[in-house]
Amino acid sequence: MEESLLITNGPVRSFYNELIENLNSCSQFKISVAFITYGGLQVLLETLKALETRDIHGEILTTTYKEMTSPQVLERLSKFKNIHLKIYVPPTQNDGFHAKGYLFHKTSLESEKWTVIIGSSNITGRALKTNVEWNVLQNENCGEQQEPGVFTKSVLDEFETLWQSPWAKEYSDEFLISYRDYLAKVKRHQKQESKLYFHTTVLQTKIPRP
């Protein structure tokens, strides 16, 4: 049985409420999201700490695209023992990463199901609670063979493709240092109107010709 719902940020209920409820009720989770700000992470910290205590494991894939996800966020997420963190580094300046998908696996004595949320919300304070956002939630029960349905399987397959991509980098201290150095270069070059592109192995500076 499938059930689809539209999630918006309203006066009574918000995307934040749905996210917290699904995190609290899942047996595992997978999140692919372009931007995670520290303000967005802050409102989720207590829930993430509770999941760590309960040994509920998850995978989070975010990105360096647009430099919206800060080194501080990556460092804090890396401290959770139950979270496997990867960072997608687009291969060229013309490639972006703007996906927002939240997957929750839920099991009970009676059933097994996936809840998938796909839409416009990043993990930022405003996106979680106040922005005009549209997100579609779909609950999909697993069949007799305990396999996900067609829709959920397609989302899981796409997540796995991105997760295993050569552009999805494991978090490490070396990665964090490289990213911080890059952001410092961006700040120094902003006044010169230069365009910088972050890569895990090189820093390329492209300054417009006069």
Predicted regions mapped to residue ranges:
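PLD/PLD-like phosphodiesterase catalytic module centered on the HKD motif
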Residues: 1-210
